[in-house]
Amino acid sequence: MTTQADDSSIKPARPYAGKSAQERQNARRLALVDAAVRLFGEQGFSAVSIDMICAEAALTKRYFYEAFASREALLTAAYESVTREYFQAILVKMTPHMADAPKLVRAGLKETFGFVRRNPVKARLMMVEAMNVRGQLGDMYGARYDDFVELLLQVTRPLLGRQAPSDKVFRVMAKAVVGALIHLCQNWIATDFAQPVDELVEGTERLFAGVGRELGVRGYN
């Protein structure tokens, strides 16, 4: 004779050190991402093995494969983490100046170069190493580049004058400005931040001002 299982015998996983199993799993994943950001940013993706990542995170391979299917999947997560942090940082600085183009541009540029200088390892991953591993990043690299371009378009559109170009031409101009900014950051990192940040901000500010006048952006007329 079979009997129905007593539901009271089915117990959830017990918390360990005050954390649930899901919380511990999330913490391990975050530790692996943080380790990957450090190692990929310092040594480059091709030089870093899964064993090195696990040692840096103080975790075993079992926990690596619990969180990620491959080293490339971890690379994508690390890149996404860094770009998200950068976007949030510049938005915080730019938001108070959305109606004033020169102040908006200056705030965004100061925080861009400031983020790079404060976080050289993260910046190397985001600005330099990402260029070398675009194939491994798949669609993520292009998506984040487009996000940066879209952010520039969104904050600029409300400030445009009547002589604004078509959206397609406007997007090309935005891509050109973003590309120039990334190239400046790459060169600054490669020269170990030799050029004073004030010179970088002023020079890039003038570039944005020229584009702003061409677009008829209020504040640059």
Residue ranges and their predicted role:
Residues 1-27, 216-221:
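N-terminal intrinsically disordered/low-complexity leader segments
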Residues 25-36, 53, 78-86:
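Generic hydrophobic, amphipathic alpha-helix propensity
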Residues 31, 35-43, 85, 89-93, ...:
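Solvent-exposed, amphipathic alpha-helical segments
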Residues 31, 39-73, 77:
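Helix-turn-helix
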Residues 77, 92-121, 201:
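Hydrophobic alpha-helical connector segments
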Residues 84, 88, 135-161, 171-183, ...:
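Amphipathic alpha-helical packing segments from all-alpha helical-bundle domains
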